[in-house]
């Protein structure tokens, strides 16, 4: 692990962070299966990349997509060290995920959507990368006055209903809203033409 990644691992992969504590339930809820192609968008330290890589197996692929070259290089290095040869790293731009067209079964966006500088462009880019019948899972912080922490209230740009409106405005439909997390929501979207597929 490169020295600049260590503090991020300590921050993101720690007991007490809901996403870390419930990571196995979150992965199960995505429906990722052996042989699938998954994009972990905003992959960060690779927590979910590693879990998806184990789940899709040798016949599947996980794209670890992040805007940070240091994060992507760390994921490449740690994946190789752990024998996960089904992981590919992609450094993306603020408005483009840089994935091959019609290549993925599930796009997973965890505690990352609120960082998108150009959410409409990013979601259109993700849509272009989806295979027919594919879906996008968005997990992000609940932003609720009186419930959410001051950090979330100040840091997270949009609440859940605004996120749903933004994503639906670029040609997606919400098809699943799972209520098993306390501090985060779990939403699944499909392109409008595929809205009856799930």
Task: Identify the residue ranges that each predicted region occupies.
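A short glycine-rich, Lys/Arg-flanked "PGG" loop and its adjoining helix->strand segment in the class I
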Residues: 54, 120-135
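Core SAM-dependent methyltransferase catalytic element
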Residues: 176-198
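A short acidic, Gly/Pro-enriched loop at the edge of an enzyme's catalytic core
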Residues: 97-106
């Amino acid at each position: 692990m490169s020295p600049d990644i260590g503090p991020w691992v300590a921050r993101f992969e720690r007991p007490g962070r809901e996403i870390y504590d419930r990571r196995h339930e979150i992965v199960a809820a995505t429906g990722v299966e052996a042989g699938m192609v998954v994009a972990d968008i905003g992959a960060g330290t690779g927590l979910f990349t590693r879990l998806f890589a184990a789940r899709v197996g040798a016949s599947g692929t996980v794209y670890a997509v992040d805007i940070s070259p240091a994060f992507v290089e760390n994921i490449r290095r740690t994946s190789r060290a752990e024998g996960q040869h089904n992981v590919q790293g992609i450094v993306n731009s603020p408005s483009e995920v840089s994935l091959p067209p019609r290549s993925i079964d599930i796009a997973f966006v965890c505690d990352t959507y609120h960082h998108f500088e150009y959410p409409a462009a990013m979601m259109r880019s993700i849509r272009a990368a989806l295979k027919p019948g594919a879906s996008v899972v968005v997990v992000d912080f609940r932003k609720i006055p009186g419930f959410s922490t001051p950090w979330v209230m100040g840091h997270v740009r949009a609440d859940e209903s605004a996120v749903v409106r933004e994503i639906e405005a670029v040609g997606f439909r919400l098809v699943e809203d799972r209520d098993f997390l306390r501090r985060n929501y779990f939403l699944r979207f499909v392109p409008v033409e595929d809205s009856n597929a799930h």
